C-alpha cells in the first residue's frame, strides 16, 4: 500500500470539497466548487441534488488528478456532509422527486408548532435527543410526501428513497446499489432512536413516513461498498461516513469524555464528547451520537450558534465598516476593549442555549465616543460570549469541568478572538496545525476501517498544536463583562416581546 492516500469528500452547505490526506494526516491536494443556493420563498432554502452530486464527483476527480494520481492511488473514501438536508428520490430512475430541502429551511415551522401543541416534545426528545424543530429531516420528508404530486402513493409502494446528503452520494457512487447512512446522520433526522440505534416505529407512524423509504444505518467507520462510477476506473472502498460536526469532533481527536471542540464558521458549532452514555440536556442542548466505530458508540452534547463569522460579513457587506473580513482583527485590536458596547447578533433569532426565534440583532451601550473599532471589537466579543453560553450549558448538563477548548474553522485563525475566548472560559483555547478537521475526521474514519491507520492511538498521535491561548484576564473583569453580555441578551429578547 505504498504511496496510497485517503480521499475525504466534504459536502457542505455552499460548496463541495475534496481533500487527499497522506499517512501523516497532511493535506496533499484540495479541490472545491461552489453551487447554487435556491430560495423559492422567504424562509425556504433548497439545493439541486444533481448539482450536489456533479460538483462532489467533479472535485473528487480533480483533487486526485491534479497531483498526477489516479483511482489506484486511493486506499479509501471518507464522506462528511451538511447534516439534516433532505433528499427524496425515485428508486427506479434514481431521479430526485424534489429539490434537496436544506437544514436552514423553515417551511415546516408551523407543522412543528402543531406537533408541540400535541404535547409530543418530551417524547421526541427522549427518543431522539432532539427538540421538535424544522431544522431536522423528519418534517421535511413529510412536506415532500404531502406536497409533491404522487409522492405519497409512490412511497407507499416502496418506490421512493430518502437520504441525507451522505446517502445520496453513496447511492450515486455505487450506481444505485447501496442505500445506507451512518448513525451520526441518522441521529439528526428526528426519526432515529439514539438508545436502540434503530429507526423508531412510533415516530414513523406519528409522522406518516413509510419505513421502506429509509436507508440502512451503519457504523461511521466500516467498508460500506465500492465505487462503481466512471469518476474512478478502479473500485475504491467507501469506508467512512459522518455528519460534518461529528467528523470535526473526531478530526480534533476529542475521543474521551469531556473533550470539547468549537468550529467557528458562519455560525458556531460546539460539541462535547460525553462517552458511551447519552446525556439528556436540561439546558436546551441537543443530545446526539458522536460516532460509532465497531461496537463502540460515543455520544455528544451539541449547541449551535446561528451567527458567528456571519457578523463579520455583515459589518463588511451590510454596514461597510470594513472592506475585507481579514481587516476586522486589526481594527478591533486598535482599542483595548469595547468601552461598554455589546452587540447581540440575533439576526435570525438566538440559537443554543436560548432558542429564541423572535430575538433580533441589537447594539447596546453606544455613546458619542463609540467608534468603528469599538463596534468591530464588540462583534468579535459576541462570538466568544455566545460560545461561552453554550459551554456553560454543557458543563451544567454533563457535570464535567471543561479542561480545554479545541478550536477550528475559519474564525479560529483570529488570534484576538481566540485570546478573548480563553479569557472568558478560564481555560486554554487550543488551535491545531490542521484546521480542516471536518475532512480530516472523515479521512481518519475511512482509513481506520481499512487498516490504513492501525488504531485510534496512531491517529491520536498525529494531532499537532499550532498555538495555545492561555487565559490572562482577571476574574472580576470577566464577571463584569459577562454580566453586561447577559443584560444585553435579556434586552434583545425583550425587544422582540411585544407584550412588554
UniProtKB/Swiss-Prot annotation:
Activity regulation comment: Inhibited by fructose 1,6-bisphosphate (FBP).
Binding site for ATP: 13-15, 266, 309, 313, 410
Gene3D superfamilies: 3.30.420.40
Pfam annotation, one family: FGGY_C
Catalysed reactions, semicolon-separated: glycerol + ATP = sn-glycerol 3-phosphate + ADP + H(+)
Coiled-coil portions: none
PROSITE patterns: FGGY_KINASES_1, FGGY_KINASES_2
GO biological process: glycerol catabolic process; glycerol metabolic process; glycerol-3-phosphate metabolic process
EC number: 2.7.1.30
Pathway(s) it belongs to: Polyol metabolism; glycerol degradation via glycerol kinase pathway; sn-glycerol 3-phosphate from glycerol: step 1/1
InterPro entries documented for this protein: ATPase_NBD, Carb_kinase_FGGY, Carb_kinase_FGGY_CS, FGGY_C, FGGY_N, Glycerol_kin
Entry GO MF terms: ATP binding; glycerol kinase activity
Binding-site residues, sn-glycerol 3-phosphate: 13, 83-84, 135, 244
GO CC annotations on file: cytosol
Signal sequence annotation: none
Function: Key enzyme in the regulation of glycerol uptake and metabolism. Catalyzes the phosphorylation of glycerol to yield sn-glycerol 3-phosphate.
Record-linked PANTHER family: GLYCEROL KINASE, SUGAR KINASE
Similarity comment: Belongs to the FGGY kinase family.
Protein name: Glycerol kinase
Amino acid at each position: 500500500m505504498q504511496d496510497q492516500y485517503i480521499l475525504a469528500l466534504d459536502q457542505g452547505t455552499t460548496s463541495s470539497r475534496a481533500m487527499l490526506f497522506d499517512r501523516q494526516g497532511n493535506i496533499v491536494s484540495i479541490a472545491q466548487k461552489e453551487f447554487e443556493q435556491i430560495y423559492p420563498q422567504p424562509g425556504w432554502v433548497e439545493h439541486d441534488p444533481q448539482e450536489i452530486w456533479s460538483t462532489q464527483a467533479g472535485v473528487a476527480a480533480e483533487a486526485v488528478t491534479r497531483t498526477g494520481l489516479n483511482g489506484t492511488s486511493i486506499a479509501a473514501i471518507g464522506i462528511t456532509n451538511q447534516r439534516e438536508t433532505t433528499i427524496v428520490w425515485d428508486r427506479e430512475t434514481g431521479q430526485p422527486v424534489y429539490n434537496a430541502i436544506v437544514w436552514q429551511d423553515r417551511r415546516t415551522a408551523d407543522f412543528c408548532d402543531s406537533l408541540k401543541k400535541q404535547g409530543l416534545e418530551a417524547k421526541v426528545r427522549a427518543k431522539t435527543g432532539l427538540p421538535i424543530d424544522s431544522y431536522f429531516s423528519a418534517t421535511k420528508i413529510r412536506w415532500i410526501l404531502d406536497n409533491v404530486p404522487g409522492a405519497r402513493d409512490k412511497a407507499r409502494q416502496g418506490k421512493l428513497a430518502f437520504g441525507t446528503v451522505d446517502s445520496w452520494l453513496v447511492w450515486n457512487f455505487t450506481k444505485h446499489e447501496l442505500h445506507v447512512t451512518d448513525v451520526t446522520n441518522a441521529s439528526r433526522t428526528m426519526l432515529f432512536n439514539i438508545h436502540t440505534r434503530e429507526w423508531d416505529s412510533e415516530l414513523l407512524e406519528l409522522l406518516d413516513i413509510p419505513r421502506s423509504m429509509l436507508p440502512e444505518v451503519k457504523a461511521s467507520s466500516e467498508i460500506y461498498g465500492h465505487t462503481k462510477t466512471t469518476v474512478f476506473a478502479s473500485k475504491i472502498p467507501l469506508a467512512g461516513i459522518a455528519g460534518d460536526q461529528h467528523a470535526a469532533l473526531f478530526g480534533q481527536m476529542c475521543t474521551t469524555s469531556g473533550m470539547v471542540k468549537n468550529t467557528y464558521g458562519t455560525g458556531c458549532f460546539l460539541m462535547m464528547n460525553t462517552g458511551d452514555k447519552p446525556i439528556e440536556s436540561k439546558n436546551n442542548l441537543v443530545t446526539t451520537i458522536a460516532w460509532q466505530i465497531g461496537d463502540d458508540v460515543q455520544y455528544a452534547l451539541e449547541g449551535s450558534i446561528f451567527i458567528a463569522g456571519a457578523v463579520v460579513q455583515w459589518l463588511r457587506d451590510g454596514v461597510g465598516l470594513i472592506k475585507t473580513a481579514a481587516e476586522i482583527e486589526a481594527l478591533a485590536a486598535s482599542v483595548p476593549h469595547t468601552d461598554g458596547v455589546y452587540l447581540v447578533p440575533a439576526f435570525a433569532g438566538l440559537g443554543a442555549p436560548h432558542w429564541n426565534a423572535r430575538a433580533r440583532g441589537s447594539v447596546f451601550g453606544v455613546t458619542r465616543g463609540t467608534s468603528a473599532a469599538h463596534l468591530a471589537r464588540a462583534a468579535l466579543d459576541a462570538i466568544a460570549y455566545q460560545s461561552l453560553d453554550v459551554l456553560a450549558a454543557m458543563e451544567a448538563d454533563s457535570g464535567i469541568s471543561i479542561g480545554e477548548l479545541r478550536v477550528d474553522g475559519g474564525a479560529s485563525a483570529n488570534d484576538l478572538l481566540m485570546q478573548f475566548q480563553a479569557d472568558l472560559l478560564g481555560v486554554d483555547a487550543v488551535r491545531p496545525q490542521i484546521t480542516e478537521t471536518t475532512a480530516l475526521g472523515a479521512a481518519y474514519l475511512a482509513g481506520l476501517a481499512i487498516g490504513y491507520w492501525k488504531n485510534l492511538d496512531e491517529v491520536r498521535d498525529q494531532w499537532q498544536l499550532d498555538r495555545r491561548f492561555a487565559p490572562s484576564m482577571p476574574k472580576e473583569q470577566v464577571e463584569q463583562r459577562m454580566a453586561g453580555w447577559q443584560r444585553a441578551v435579556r434586552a434583545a429578547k425583550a425587544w422582540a416581546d411585544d407584550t412588554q
